[in-house]
């Protein structure tokens, strides 16, 4: 099965942590990593380090091009971005349809707001997002719940609820992406 796995959630919700902890970087297209390809970290007026949002249009154009190439190759791909807007997800779904991919959303929006703010503060300085931005994104996530594909609710504190006796998601690479896909297919696609 050709899978497109779309991670969705506010900054600091654990999307990139999920990818890193499970050694899935080689399957992942990350908007933050693409932003850092376009521009170095910059120092804001407040003296803090930031990843610039100035090139967002270019970032997403490149993301879509890279995604299409991966789909032409038949590669399972994970999209690591907030994915709070229908417009960005619509392009993923358009490509998934063209290349016969099964799109799945792993939704990190169930993370408690206070925990989200704590996790945001514990990130690398350049990845810390202003609280008002997180609040706006949480509102966007709430207003757009269940507006697209098969959604897998994820709270990385509750992996065992979803993965039973497979040693949790931490063992994804050991189990292999095929087992991951099998479990998602069995639990969420074969309803």
Model-based region annotation:
Residues 2, 74-75, 101:
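Short, high-confidence coil segments that cap the C-terminus of an alpha-helix
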Residues 2-8, 13-17, 21-27, 98, ...:
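Conserved GTP-binding G-domain of TRAFAC-class P-loop NTPases and closely related GTPase folds
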Residues 16-75, 114-117:
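Conserved substrate/cofactor phosphate-moiety recognition/catalytic segment
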Residues 34, 81-83:
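Conserved Walker B
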Residues 41-42, 83-127:
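ATP-dependent NMP and nucleoside kinases share a basic, alpha-helical "lid"
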Residues 53-64, 86, 131-138:
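Amphipathic alpha-helical transducer elements in NTP-driven molecular machines
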Residues 65-68, 90-97, 139:
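Surface-exposed alpha-helical segments enriched in charged/polar residues
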């Amino acid at each position: 099965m050709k899978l497109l796995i779309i991670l969705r959630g506010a900054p600091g919700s654990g999307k990139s942590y999920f990818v890193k902890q499970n050694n899935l970087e080689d399957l992942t297209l990350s908007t933050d990593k693409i932003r850092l390809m376009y521009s170095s970290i910059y120092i804001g007026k407040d003296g803090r380090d930031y990843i610039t949002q100035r090139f967002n249009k270019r970032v997403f154009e490149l993301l879509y091009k890279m995604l299409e190439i991966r789909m032409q190759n038949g590669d399972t791909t994970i999209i690591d971005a907030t994915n709070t807007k229908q417009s960005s997800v619509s392009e993923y779904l358009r490509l998934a349809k063209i290349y016969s991919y099964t799109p799945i959303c792993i939704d990190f929006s169930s993370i408690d707001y206070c925990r989200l703010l704590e996790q945001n503060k514990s990130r690398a300085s350049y990845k810390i997002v202003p609280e008002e931005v997180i609040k706006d994104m949480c509102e966007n996530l709430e207003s757009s719940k269940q507006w697209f594909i098969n959604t897998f609710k994820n709270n990385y504190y509750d992996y065992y609820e979803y993965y039973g006796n497979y040693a949790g998601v931490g063992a994804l690479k050991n189990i292999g992406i095929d087992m991951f896909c099998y479990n998602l297919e069995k639990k969420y696609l074969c309803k």
